[in-house]
């Protein structure tokens, strides 16, 4: 039986651990060739080993996403090698400082915005032409409930995810008349290292695993997925539309 994503090229950021790692493996199992991007070489090599064990294939790209020129070079390399991109999963993110806003220095604020917002903006700029070369370009960006909760002491993270959501929804509107479908995925509380750092008193064994969440991202990357500009909430298993105030 032909794998559902056979011959598809999938770019996944933050692929060395957590949801990105699990999503990269799941996409590869579904037949996609995965272009795995992360800062951590060791994590990428471990991912490559697992993908090969599963019978899949991957290209490893050690890249800090604050290297915005590096993202542009990656786009050029993908164009030269594949001529297209079928799937973009913007997963990489950082939590940033957990402090009152008035106590946060400008540098850590900028660091959070660089990874969570600007890197995704640069991915959109550099990968859109490649996604347009696909017969069914699909983009999924990982967000958080923090975008709307305005939780105390998580200001940089919440603000960055709110900005990401507006960025992604805008792109979805701009590409609505094309074959590209653009959506957001909110995993909610998941058993990741970043979650453990922000909530150290939480029992991780009460949380779902990245592998469980990844199984819901894969269908959003399929040519059969027709929705765009939507928000999939993993915790409630609900696909939501955004509503603007009247």
Residues covered by each model-derived region:
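Conserved glycine-rich Rossmann-like NAD(P)H-binding loop of the short-chain dehydrogenase/reductase
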Residues: 30-46
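C-terminal helical subdomain
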Residues: 177, 184-185, 192, 201-246
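The beta1-alpha1 cofactor-binding region of Rossmann-like NAD(H)/NADP(H)-dependent oxidoreductases
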Residues: 42, 62-73, 106
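Substrate-binding pocket helix/loop in short-chain dehydrogenase/reductase
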Residues: 99-101, 108-110
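Active-site helix of classical SDR
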Residues: 124, 160
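Conserved glycine-rich cofactor-binding loop
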Residues: 16-18
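Residue(s) in the substrate-gating loop at a strand-loop-helix junction
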Residues: 144
